[in-house]
Amino acid sequence: MSTDAKNAIAQMEKIVSLCKRRGFIFQSSEIYGGCGGVWDYGPLGAELKRNLRNVWWNTMTREREDVLGLDASILMNPAIWKASGHVDTFADLMRECSLTNKRVRADHVEPQDGVVMNYSGAKSPTGWKLARPISVLMKKGEHIESLRKRVRTLIASNAGEAAGKVEEIELLDEAKGDTLERTIDFHPETGGALGDARPFNLMLKTYLGPTATEADVTYLRPETAQAIFAQFKNVYDSSRMKVPFGIGQIGKAFRNEVTPKNFTFRSREFEQMELEFFIKPDEAVEIISGKVDTWSEGADLSEPKPNWGWQMWHRYWVDQRTKFYEGIGLGDVLEYYWQTPEDLAHYARACVDILCEFPFGTEELEGIAARGDFDLSAHQTASTKSQEIFDEELKTAAAKLTAEQKDALRARKQEEGRNTVKKKAEKERREPTADDFAAMEKSMNYFCDRLFAGNYVPHVIEPSAGLDRMALAVIAKAFSETEKVDEKGKKEIITVLRLHPRVAPIKVGVFPLLKNKPELVAKAREVYALLKKHMNCFYDETASIGRRYARQDEAGTPFGVTIDFETCGEKGPELADTVTLRHRDSGEQERVKITDLLGKLLPLVS
Ligand code: ATP
């Protein structure tokens, strides 16, 4: 293992241990040995998550005039997941271990070296038999006896009680096979030969209602976005918004991830924060504004304009989301991956992944996709309920087009349609058929007819972020260690969590200098009562003041307020009712009047 990899593991271990020690994140069901890929947020974690949620909600909905919120259910009619494509295609390619049936993601098998050992089967004195051949990789450096023991143990745990005692299982007709280098055909943990790659759907199934037949199957939502599409018309009709506008939602999502890993980064239950921002198709913008503004380097993205096409809107949201991350202290650890045409889904026009530096590598934090009208159109077809909106301005502008202008637009759409058919067929590795072209021609003509009458299915830009990944990203970014010499001259490593004040779970620690001085305690409780109505504070009177600062540094608290004898007026009237305000990151300490505290702190933490 490389030094970098070892350091990354060590860093993650420290972060996981801090999260448990200070009550940020616990393993779910820990007293029962845990529950794979599921995590619980402790008192500090719950506050941190709530702050992140609030920053997202405020920035994305409340502070904007063009985005509304939604809070939809986790369980929905399974027809939604059929229409969205999740039932048929939301799958990872998996390979199964022939020894244990344990699955592994096909693209997660690291190459291994070793010798193949073959057995015709196994039996035990209980009469139990395994009547099929098995092949296992004896890894380079592994002793044959330890391989046999491993195989017996795996067989026994798969067979259950019937196989009897592990040590009494007999492996039959052992034969040495090929020596392999960099093989990816054996399970990385068990060493058992892997079967062919097969798709494995990531949706978690459940049954709705008292009977548990196939007709009652539904799914825990694997993303929050589909509810936004399914409720698009209700929100549109009830809010009197005009396109362009967006609908944002925060909520739980579930994916039966095959290999949940890297702490909360890849979980089976997690929270998403998604925005579907609905825009006019470029053709509608062109008819209304005469020309569509497309993106070029240096384009002004500060304020949306009526002539923006999808490209500008996509770039705008990448810019907005970048500003969001800057506002929570992640600005300098972001990278962008623009998906190539080969990466893109056939309906997507562009997609950028916002990546973040984690100890285990630079990984996706958020995806921002321009998805055309794929989602609303899919629901329109499947539900047979129109998802079109009527745009008076478009109708008026279209009425002024000449017949030639309309024909030219139609011809352009037909050409685009033919190219889409070819591209889709190419992705599916087949020849496009005459029927494909005929269907596309019909659909393009329909689109133009409806457009000229002022109707269209809105297109969408989708910034989709994960709350748990964001929480982990801010913790990982904030984690730092410094060496300190304590009061007795002993060196110790102090952990300081340099969380941005906006997301820090506790904003201010309030400390009376001494706990046995009633006047200090009374004043400190007064300050605590004043602040806690406006922000999450922590009152602490135990241990030395240095220890108390250190405890709050480790919890990520950005400010500390100490109430001392000066506060009580013992060193003259000019310092009476002032406190020491300590800034975690700069170490600066300043004297502030109690009456000025709130005004000073509020802008820093919100
Ligand atoms: P990945 O490629 O990492 O599996 P994805 O591209 O499938 O992610 P999306 O479907 O685009 O992810 O989901 C949007 C966001 O939801 C992701 O950027 C991520 O922040 C979050 N997310 C997705 N899957 C998980 C998961 N298993 N655990 C935690 N967060 C997740």
Task: Spell out what each predicted region is.
Residues M1-S606:
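NTP/phosphate- and nucleic-acid-binding module
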